[in-house]
Amino acid sequence: MKPTLFLLAAGMGSRYGGLKQLDGLGPNGETIMDYSIYDAINAGFGKLVFVIRKDFEQDFREKIISKYEGHIPCELIFQALDNLPEGFTCPAERTKPWGTNHAVMMGADVIQEPFAVINCDDFYGRDSFQVMGKFLSALPEGAKNTYAMVGFRVGNTLSESGTVSRGICGTNADHLLTSVVERTKIQRIDGEVKYIDDNGEWTATPDTTPVSMNFWGFTPDYFAYSKEFFKAFLSDPKNMENLKSEFFIPLMVDKLINDGTATVEVLDTTSKWFGVTYPEDRQSVVDKIQALVDAGEYPAKLF
């Protein structure tokens, strides 16, 4: 069974004005997401599932889904604030979505096969889809608790325009994930990659340190674990009272690896990540995509 690609398209970038998922950056107005989908199809993925906000549906169908019809089957699902487990009610004042893992949970009814999860506004590169596609396609029928994450080398994921947030990964000798620690301020200073640690000190880390760019591989059992843990998350009064609390994928993954329920293999990739974190990054992304097209990595027109 071919794996599915699950695309997180419900969030709007807080730093970069407007819907960056729809920004045309390729030579024929291609979005970053177009390149991800092109790479995924070539890596053996068989279906796309997009999670979006309901009020964005018409725009999304017209501008996005129509492009891929005839190339790969597509499903559209919705992330809503009030889509909570029985017994829980969303605070009336809350406007922020419940986070990336809540978005993933929306796929439970339409995904019965191994699947990868990506952000729509990150350029992950061909090799990262190849390594994830290979991992998911090799899983035996009915596999459970055997997950993966593409580990980008931190030096390949920085922005020239400012600091970035990354999940810094700890791994063991078997390349299994042992921890993901979100660091919100990472940049290159005097040639070294540094981040601000819990004590407010700048700390150096090697260029090759694996980081999570939210490119995960799961099997469908992940949905049931998420549902149970989300109930525990919502049962904590501080998560309900904090209108900006979020149920992130690393939070869920961290729990499953710490209690020994699942393993997460960190897949190394040579791909260089890029994306538009800040408006000033846009031109650099346009130039990088053009360079890949000029080098023959991608056709000038994808679909």
Give the location of each predicted region.
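Active-site metal-binding loops of divalent metal-dependent hydrolases
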Residues: 12, 122, 154
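Conserved catalytic-core motifs of eukaryotic protein kinase domains, centered on the activation segment
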Residues: 18-19
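Phosphate- and divalent-cation-binding pockets in alpha/beta enzyme and binding domains
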Residues: 59-60, 225, 252, 284
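Conserved core of the sugar-phosphate nucleotidyltransferase
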Residues: 126-215, 220
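Catalytic beta-strand/loop signature of glycosyltransferases that borders the donor
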Residues: 210, 265-271
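A C-terminal functional module that forms or caps the active site or interfaces directly
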Residues: 226-262
